[in-house]
Amino acid sequence: MDNQPPLPPVPPANPPVPPPAPTGPKTIYINYFDVITDAKVKVLMAVCSELLSQQKPDVLYFLFSSNGGNVNAGITLYNFLKALPLEIVMHNAGSIDSIATVIFMAGTKRYASKHSTFLFHGIASQFESKTTLDRNKFKEFLSALEQDENKIAGIIAGTTKLSQEEIRGLFLQGESKDLTFAMDKGVIQEIKDAAIPKGATIISLNLN
């Protein structure tokens, strides 16, 4: 009987390659701590448009704090953010006041850091020195003021549990509200501190 050399060991089959780990949505963080003016809103809208066309994120996550500003600029920014084809997350990083509350409502998800606040109040306007108002001009001004308050009340009522009657009461009070109120009334969904992942893209728009 011939002595046959032992057969070489059969190499193990290549183990299956695991599928790549699922990646979360591409999120870009935008830090905005500033007032709301026509010029600043134009810059912010331009930045958002450029991010969408060049980086194509799935989520824009705003760390947002503002003491308000121009009503028309704020409503324009709200409508612009609502129109974007991606998710908007708003996170109150300090204080959301006046028309900034409307912009905050553009978030499909809304959070607030501990110790942050919200301030709801009515609209005020400043007149230039020696401005003269006749009856018709005064009526026109008052009508525009009422329409702006109606728009603000409608947006907030449509995105929270607050009724328009409650919102108009807040306009008269001009009162700062805590996070318990914000949670109860659906202004926010959660109280949590912001946490930006390591390596995330963050843009600060704290403009001069």
Q: Residue spans of the language-model regions?
A:
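N-terminal organellar transit peptides
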Residues: 1-208
